[in-house]
A protein has these predicted regions:
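Cytoplasmic helix-loop-helix junction between adjacent transmembrane helices
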Residues: 7-44
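Intracellular juxtamembrane helix-capping segments at the cytosolic ends
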Residues: 17-30, 224-238
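Helix-loop-helix hairpin linking two adjacent transmembrane segments in secondary transporters
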Residues: 32-33, 37-91, 137
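Flexible cytoplasmic inter-helical loops of multi-pass small-molecule transporters
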Residues: 84-109
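Extracytoplasmic gate region of multi-pass secondary transporters
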Residues: 115-167
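Helix-to-loop junctions at the C-terminal end of transmembrane segments
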Residues: 166-180, 269
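C-terminal transmembrane helical hairpin of 12-TM major facilitator-type secondary transporters
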Residues: 180-232
């Protein structure tokens, strides 16, 4: 058990580090192609999640649980080798004047007391709490309603896969579209998410169609909220150092909020699996994410 906790903590730190700094890397090395390269790295991230959701069970059945751990160890090792190979070529891509920009960014008001930055934190936390709560507890909720285990697997895979086209299209749309276009995207996610949250009040069914629609609608809303806020880290900041500050602040606070979701939902689920308390929480989280998205669109720069 101790080694499992230590290993999980190390994995979490590695993921958190990359999540925070990838938006600033994109801003630093590809300032004129933020949309394209945000699409590239987020697509690969979500594709990896979907792929491993599919292959984990077959590999464990075929070769044992330890074989999956080997695969998981080799994957970051390959990423490290590629990164070490590319490192000597990266420093030439950042212009020297950015050293002065760093001093300016660090001397600005602290990001944690910047009211505009809190919109990013709340939006990131809202979509994260939705995502982690859904993935942790929806299989149990569907099983409670007598949905077959095979069907549950397909529905959860659909939840993951719906985000892939969003990762390809949304960042470039956010770069190209003006304020009205961005507001439309946020509004579409909000409306879709509220419809999905409203459906949970009528969840007493084992219908595959019902739960598939629920999964796709909520997957679209969460995926769009996530891609929106990650892309806006770069768009709404003037340099990579400020991007790193904003990304770190929003994700640190956001993931802290997200950690509360599965625990509190589990407590409510234990009291009443079909209770309205958890359904109202979904509505509140969607509403908060939508409102914060509108505020972010109207924010010029941080």
């Amino acid at each position: 058990m101790p080694t499992m906790i230590i290993g999980t903590s190390l994995i979490g730190m590695g993921i958190a580090y990359l999540n925070v700094y990838m938006p600033s890397f994109v801003t630093a090395y590809f300032p004129s192609n933020i949309g394209l390269y945000t699409s590239v790295y987020t697509f690969s991230m979500m594709f990896g999640v979907a792929l491993f959701n599919v292959i984990t069970a077959p590999i464990m059945v075929w070769a044992g649980w330890w074989s999956m751990l080997i695969v998981l160890a080799i994957t970051p090792l390959l990423a490290l080798i590629i990164w070490l190979f590319l490192m000597p070529h990266l420093s030439e891509e950042i212009h020297e004047p950015q050293v002065e920009v760093k001093k300016e960014a660090m001397s600005n008001d602290q990001i944690w007391v910047n009211k505009k930055a809190w919109a990013f934190l709340i939006m990131f936390g809202s979509q994260s709490i939705l995502n982690y709560t859904f993935t942790a507890w929806m299989p149990s909720l569907m099983a409670y309603h007598q949905v077959g285990s095979g069907v549950i697997g397909i529905i959860m895979a659909a939840f993951s896969l719906i985000g892939l086209p969003i990762t390809v299209l949304l960042p470039q749309l956010l770069v190209k579209w003006g304020r009205l276009g961005k507001l439309f995207l946020v509004g579409s996610a909000g409306v879709t998410g509220l419809i999905a949250s409203g459906m949970l009040f009528f969840q007493n069914t084992s219908s595959t169609i019902f739960w598939m629609i629920e999964s796709l609608l909520l997957g679209y809303a969460i995926g769009l909220f996530f891609m929106f806020v990650v892309t806006m880290f770069a768009i709404k900041t003037s340099n990579p150092y400020r991007t790193a500050q904003l990304s770190g602040m929003a994700q640190a606070g956001g993931y802290f909020i997200a950690a509360l979701g599965p625990v509190t939902y589990g407590w409510a689920f234990g009291l009443n699996p079909t209770g309205n308390l958890q359904n109202v929480a979904f509505v509140v989280a969607i509403t908060l994410a939508t409102i914060m998205g509108v505020i972010i669109v109207k924010t010029k720069k941080i």
